[in-house]
Amino acid sequence: MGLLECCARCLIGAPFASLVATGLCFFGVALFCGCGHEALTGTEQLIETYFSKNYQDYEFLIDVIHGFQYFIYGTAAFFFLYGALLLAEGFYTTGAVRQIFGDYRTTICGKGLSATVTGGPKGRGARGPQRAHSWQRVCHCLGKWLGHPDKFVGITYVLTIIWLLVFACSAVPVYIYFNTWTTCQSIGNPTKTSASIGTLCADARMYGILPWNAFPGKVCGSNLLSICKTSEFQMTFHLFIAAFVGAAATLVSLVTFIIATTYNFAVLRLMGRGTKF
């Protein structure tokens, strides 16, 4: 078999949907977690500097921000592991589907994964059998999961519903910063609005960011315009937009995972007549 023919058969058997979804998932999660973390830090600095001088006014806000940042850490770790499992599931089920259709039976990765799941070669040496036995138990557990794509369909479906809420929440700070930026544009171009510049304000209390007794709690007129021109505000605004885009990319990847996994499961169940693999 020539090199080109071998590469062509590998490409034919590759689960392209799972590969694209995994890459999109890792990209989206990295963008959401990295930019979201820095955007929350920038928001904390803006509140402390311009909207309130009393620590008690934004003490609860800081706790909430830190809680979201810890959530981001957990999200990054979880999606890294789950994305790798979904990619392995894609190789595993795609090999079985190719076998049913009589195509190239499995990919090189699928063969390696199958060998790993079945235990692989035995260990050597005094501690070899013990290590091999422990590794076989882990692989056996992994094989049970990879052999049941319906579990991945259910988990990914629930995860997609949860991520829809995360996606909606990531749009809230973008909306707040966009309103503030629009107000600054009106202040910078007085001819575009009939209101006086002094009445154009950004009130953090209105969005529930600060309590109503916070002072000053809002910034108006030329002071607000000067804030919008700072690098901190512009950077934080763009970071929230990037985090929103990352959340959208992650949502698309999860939907792609659902479609690919559901298709493989349906083919294996209907055309494979329920054969376990």
From Swiss-Prot:
Which compartments is it annotated to reside in?
Cell membrane
The record lists its disulfide bonds as 184-228, 201-220
Keywords assigned by UniProt, alphabetized: Cell membrane, Disulfide bond, Lipoprotein, Membrane, Palmitate, Transmembrane, Transmembrane helix
Extracellular topological segments: 37-59, 179-238
Query: Which residue spans belong to the Cytoplasmic compartment?
Result: 2-10, 89-151, 269-277
> Recorded GO terms, molecular function?
structural constituent of myelin sheath
Topological type in the membrane: Multi-pass membrane protein
Residues covalently joined to lipid (O-palmitoyl threonine): 199
Where, by residue number, does the polypeptide cross the bilayer?
A: 11-36, 60-88, 152-178, 239-268
According to its UniProt entry, the protein's GO biological process terms are: axon development; central nervous system myelination
InterPro entries of this UniProt entry? Myelin_PLP (IPR001614), Myelin_PLP_CS (IPR018237)
A Gene Ontology cellular-component term: plasma membrane
Q: Where is the lipid attached (S-palmitoyl cysteine)?
A: 6-7, 10, 109, 139, 141
Function according to Swiss-Prot or TrEMBL:
This is the major myelin protein from the central nervous system. It plays an important role in the formation or maintenance of the multilamellar structure of myelin.
Question: What protein am I looking at?
Answer: Myelin proteolipid protein
Which gene is transcribed and translated to give this protein?
PLP1
